[in-house]
A protein has these predicted regions:
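Rossmann-fold NAD(P)-binding glycine/threonine-rich loop
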Residues: 3, 8-34
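Conserved active-site and cofactor/substrate-binding residues in soluble primary-metabolism enzymes
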Residues: 19, 23, 43-44, 98-106, ...
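Alpha-helical support elements that line or immediately flank enzyme active sites
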Residues: 43-55
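C-terminal helical cap and adjacent loop that interface with cofactors, partners, or active-site loops
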Residues: 175-250
Length: 250
């Protein structure tokens, strides 16, 4: 009977497999409880993309990009878990990020479902940037020729072409090739009529709390999730989540 709002990389639960998904749904039905996953990415950025789509008469493609120099995120385990530090040519590297971040695929599936798209497949692609010299980040070392940046893309495809793309571009420092430019935030682009571009980023990149930015979309969703029907719910099934009761009127 306990409603759950989580930022633990959970959107639809499909990554857990059919058997575990059925267990969750059955438990939710018995307890009349709901479970919802949110955060920034996956999370609020996909809601922004869906809301932006309402301004279009025709949509050819929606792209969501997270692009950042993540050197300040001092978690060697996280980076090593998605392939950083391995040789660029390591045949096992491409599958690491896909296995470690299944909720990004779930987010694409959620958007496709919300837009009523008959998706044929969700494709995963990745490319790497190699360190141009030995790099010591303080919390991990990356040897020359090893992975120091990656670009991933999960794309929902209809009639053989990508109609929704979720892209990630992460790098650790600037001693890498290719040295991709980054946006230091999130960018939503819609190709269509009209074509749109939305940028969501901290005004002062070095002075914000990423944990707070991740938590608040979940906190603001609590009331809506408690009122939702039992089971796994996604953003398109809830009312618009806003920052109610947060405006400083003093």
């Amino acid at each position: 009977g306990c409603n759950i709002v989580s930022t633990a990389y959970f959107i639809t639960g499909s990554m857990l497999g059919a058997e575990n998904l059925a267990r969750i749904e059955a438990a939710a039905a018995r307890g009349n409880a709901s479970i919802y996953g949110s955060g920034v990415n996956p999370g609020i950025i996909h809601i922004i993309a869906l809301v932006a789509s309402s301004g279009c008469a025709r949509i050819d493609k929606i792209s969501v990009l997270e692009s950042v120099d993540a050197t300040a995120y001092a978690s060697a385990g996280t980076w090593e878990g998605i392939g950083f530090g391995r040789r660029v040519e390591d045949p096992e590297a491409p599958a690491l990020a896909e296995r470690a971040m299944p909720s990004f695929k779930e987010a694409v599936a959620m958007m496709a479902s919300a837009l009523r798209l008959p998706v044929e497949e969700i494709r995963y692609d990745v490319e790497y940037a190699a360190a141009t010299e030995d790099v010591d980040l303080g919390y991990m070392r990356i040897g020359k020729g090893c992975i120091s940046g990656l670009r991933c893309c999960w794309s929902a495809r209809v009639n053989g072409r990508a109609v929704i793309e979720l892209k990630i571009a992460w790098k650790l420092g600037d001693k890498l090739a290719p040295n991709w430019p980054v946006e230091d935030g999130w960018v939503v682009e819609i190709d269509g009529d009209p074509s749109l571009r939305c940028v969501y980023q901290p005004r002062h990149m070095g002075q914000f709390d990423p944990g707070l930015m991740t938590a608040m979309p979940a906190v603001h969703a609590i009331a809506a999730v408690c009122a939702a029907p039992a089971g796994i719910v996604t953003a398109d099934q809830l009312p618009l989540i806003i920052g109610a009761h947060t405006v400083n009127i003093a």
